[in-house]
């Protein structure tokens, strides 16, 4: 599927992230997670595993959201949502993604039902990396 192709099913979920620098964010998701570029900019669209991530600068309001302004996180320590990446081997993801430039907040922690750790992207968006146990 490219960015103009409608989904084969009735619903296809994408994650939209407001970023301050499209190129920097695109490079981060490509180098750390191996995301493939579907569209280069305005907005950047990346294919990652079985979904798409859309990266665009803030702005607004617009005619279809007349009271809404989009902006990157003002405070990375306050979050109302996050990207959740599920992996088979969190130790491998931690090792590989750290080597590619990801900075984890902590080493993976075992919570009984899952082992998880968190990364921040260049704008401070929180990314959970989790392995179900």
Model segments located where?
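Conserved active-site tyrosine of GNAT-family acetyltransferases
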Residues: 25-30, 97, 124
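Short, basic/low-complexity N-terminal boundary segments at the transition from targeting/disordered tails
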Residues: 11-27
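Short glycine-/small-residue motifs
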Residues: 126-129
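Short, solvent-exposed loop/helix junctions and linker helices
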Residues: 19, 84-87
């Amino acid at each position: 599927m490219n960015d103009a192709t409608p989904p084969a099913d009735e619903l296809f979920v994408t994650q939209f992230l407001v970023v301050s620098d499209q190129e920097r964010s695109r490079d981060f998701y490509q180098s750390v997670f191996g995301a493939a570029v579907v569209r280069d900019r305005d907005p950047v669209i990346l294919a990652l595993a079985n979904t798409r991530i859309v990266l665009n600068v803030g702005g607004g309001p617009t005619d279809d959201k007349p009271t809404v302004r989009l902006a990157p996180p003002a405070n990375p320590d306050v979050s109302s949502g996050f990207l959740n990446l599920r992996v088979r081997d969190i130790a491998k993801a931690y090792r590989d993604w750290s080597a590619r430039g990801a900075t984890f907040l902590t080493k993976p922690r075992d919570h009984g039902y899952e082992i998880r750790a968190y990364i921040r992207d260049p704008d401070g968006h929180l990314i959970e990396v989790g392995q179900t146990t």
